[in-house]
Amino acid sequence: MVNIRPDEISSIIRQQIDKYDQAIQVSNVGTVLQIGDGIARVYGLDQVMAGELLEFEDKTIGIALNLESDNVGVVLMGEGRGILEGSSVKATGKIAQVPVGKSYLGRVVNALGTPIDGKGDINCSETRLIESIAPGIISRKSVCEPIQTGITAIDSMIPIGRGQRELIIGDRQTGKSSVAIDTIINQKGEDVVCVYVAVGQKAATVASIVTTLEEKGALDYTCIVAANADDPATLQYIAPYTGAAIAEYFMYNGQATLVIYDDLSKQASAYREMSLLLRRPPGREAFPGDVFYLHSRLLERAAKLSDKLGGGSMTALPVIETQAGDVSAYIPTNVISITDGQIFLSGDLFNAGIRPAINVGISVSRVGSAAQIKAMKQVAGKLKLELAQFAELEAFSQFASDLDQATRNQLARGQRLREILKQPQNSPISVEEQVAIIYTGINGYLDDIAVDKVRRFVTNLRTNLKNSKPQYAEIIRNTKTFNSDAENLLKSAIADTKQSFV
């Protein structure tokens, strides 16, 4: 007969009870009431946060945007074809994040940070919130360093500084993207990380931009975030924030960054589409009431950080497309009021062969000469005034038949100044050469050269300076000033070029 020992049995039971762990998994689950047009109405998610990520049964991710009393309006970040009415939705408890790191340089990714260039996965251990708070007042420093675009008209009259927000605005096909791409190409060797965000563009356009940057050797320090025209409105809406998050990683690590949002008109349209489908009340031009906040919270993330935070910077160049040159429409006026200046590209100038087609009259940089080296300040001071007076005289001279000699001289000078500011695409000019070109034009050295030969003369002068007067560029590069030695070298180069110029 088996001898039963009650004390042993009770100790075994006690041990089992001690080891028992009742793990309760609590998840916030809701039900899809309605689905269509990239929007889902979900019932039962009472504890969900604004902007929280939700997971549907088919693994599609959505963002909770509308929190109403009886349902939640969710925008889908994908096709969502497998989602049915009555299917379940789970709250993840997470806010949208994107992986960040140096591995993103030279890559093309979508709005969620997933590579779409066929070069394999990107390994990053760090992530950043897609929407993070902009640096505060104490964290910032005033803009004091230039970011050279390589475009003479911009660097001389509408200078851009590191940490500035400068709007590029104009009608379609006026060269807005070209200005942005030229600026990226000109950062070669400057230790500036560039992020190009393409919103609502054709895939072919993005592919040609990638090819251009690759040919010019600029893709190595650039990341491209693309939300193409056929992507859901949600991805077009979050793509600029993803680009800002990738750039912020480098900014907080003490590096200078440049972000181009091309373009924010399409982002606003995508946001309008989402808002109307979510039944938010429409305002002016059918945009929702918070469309200003859409752009301000994005552009306020651009900053020049204080030395305590590493002195990094994020320069933002948002692009806005106008309709028939109307800069007083809703989105253009909003973004003009948020940014620190604008570069206005005119269709009329573009068609007249003046490229880049910058309208100097209404283009402005609110940072001004703080974003220029001393050498540029010394020579470019008169340029904007001379061009403004020339534009006025040119309009007046169409009606007046006989003009005095002084007016004729001023018109001739103005035509030559306008000529030296013309520049072919993807051909940035170094700041030393820009100083030389402007000095030559402002001081009348081109007055005796025919207008149609000015550009050839300038090309010859640049070649002459590079080959026979390399000390000139060294002086400006090292001292950042246009001193008497540099001036004498330049005058000598101008004289030599004139002698050999036929």
UniProtKB/Swiss-Prot annotation:
Cellular localisation: Plastid, Chloroplast thylakoid membrane
Species of origin: Guillardia theta
Domain of life: Eukaryota
SUPFAM superfamilies to which the protein is assigned, alphabetical: C-terminal domain of alpha and beta subunits of F1 ATP synthase, N-terminal domain of alpha and beta subunits of F1 ATP synthase, P-loop containing nucleoside triphosphate hydrolases
Gene behind this protein: atpA
Assembly: F-type ATPases have 2 components, CF(1) - the catalytic core - and CF(0) - the membrane proton channel. CF(1) has five subunits: alpha(3), beta(3), gamma(1), delta(1), epsilon(1). CF(0) has four main subunits: a, b, b' and c.
Gene Ontology MF term list: ADP binding; ATP binding; proton-transporting ATP synthase activity, rotational mechanism
Keyword Membrane: yes
Keywords, alphabetical: ATP synthesis, ATP-binding, CF(1), Chloroplast, Hydrogen ion transport, Ion transport, Membrane, Nucleotide-binding, Plastid, Thylakoid, Translocase, Transport
Entry keyword Metal-binding: no
Protein name, entry field: ATP synthase subunit alpha, chloroplastic
